[in-house]
């Protein structure tokens, strides 16, 4: 069955003028600190299997909390935003929420202060960095989903999962949004990338896959110590996405498998 034009793979780049990066604001090299690595990469990369970057495999054992131009990637949406103006790792997170309320900014800063001054940034805390969005935004995840991705007719958000997306430049920290129509992902903070024009910009990393385009959802567990746990999502047109670092891997796997199966069953019933 031929999908609608909206279901077809595409990249969308905002038409607003990207902000130029000054020399003093160039991204600093990633720290070797395990805790700081859990913020994920700050550089945009193409979706890729975990073996594409060693940090991806490390992230598979965590719990979530190439400045070169990438190849054409369907399902990936680029939205240039103003680059961070300080070295505070929280600033990009604040930037995501500042248009919604001043209160959200205060909550976010307090969150970072508590993490930074604590004895350690525990794995549980890293998972809560994403999930705290529900407390920061008055409308909860449903409102957040609508603001980031818009919604289709009769679309409702079912579940959200803090996790990482595997890319060629390392794991991207963010949240998976599962609705009755789509699987979507948005990074916690903007990432650095080079636009086709050669201009350096920052963009939130967003992936949107209609459930009609999902071919399979594959749980993958590598028996190591600790075990590496992934969820591989493949599309009908040959693309795949690897997610890892879930707070509750079994729950995320169950809901993704069930949602895709239910959609395919309903779709088959309608078309039949």
From Swiss-Prot:
Pfam families: GRAM (PF02893)
Residue ranges of domain GRAM in the record: 143-221
Cellular component per GO, a single term: plastid
Family matches, as SMART domains: GRAM
Region annotation (Disordered) ranges: 1-42
Source organism superkingdom: Eukaryota
GO biological process annotation, one example: regulation of seed germination
Biased composition (Basic and acidic residues): 16-27
Stated family: Belongs to the GEM family.
Protein name: GEM-like protein 5
Record organism: Arabidopsis thaliana
């Amino acid at each position: 069955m031929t999908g609608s034009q909206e279901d077809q793979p595409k990249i969308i780049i905002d038409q607003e003028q990207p902000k130029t990066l000054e020399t003093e604001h160039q991204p600093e090299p990633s720290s070797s600190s395990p805790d700081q690595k859990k913020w994920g990469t700050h550089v945009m990369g193409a979706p890729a299997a975990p073996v594409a970057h060693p940090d991806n495999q490390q992230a598979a054992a965590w719990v979530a909390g190439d400045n070169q131009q990438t190849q054409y990637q369907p399902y990936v949406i680029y939205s240039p935003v103003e680059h961070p103006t300080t070295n505070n790792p929280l600033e990009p997170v604040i930037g995501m929420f500042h248009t919604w309320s001043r209160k959200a900014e205060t909550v976010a800063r307090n969150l970072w202060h508590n993490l930074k001054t604590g004895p350690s940034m525990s794995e549980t805390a890293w998972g809560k960095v994403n999930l705290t969005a529900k407390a920061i935004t008055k409308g909860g995840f449903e409102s957040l989903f609508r603001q980031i991705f818009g919604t289709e007719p009769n679309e409702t958000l079912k579940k959200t999962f803090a996790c990482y997306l595997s890319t060629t430049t390392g794991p991207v920290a963010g949240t998976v949004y599962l609705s009755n129509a789509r699987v979507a992902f948005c990074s916690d903070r903007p990432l650095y990338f080079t636009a086709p024009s050669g201009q350096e910009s920052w963009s939130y990393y967003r992936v949107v896959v209609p459930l009609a385009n999902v071919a399979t959802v594959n749980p993958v567990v590598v028996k190591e110590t600790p075990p590496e746990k992934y969820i591989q999502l493949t599309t009908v047109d040959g693309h795949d996405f690897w997610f890892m670092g879930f707070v509750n891997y079994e729950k995320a796997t169950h809901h993704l498998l069930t949602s895709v199966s239910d959609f395919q069953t309903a779709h088959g019933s309608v078309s039949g």
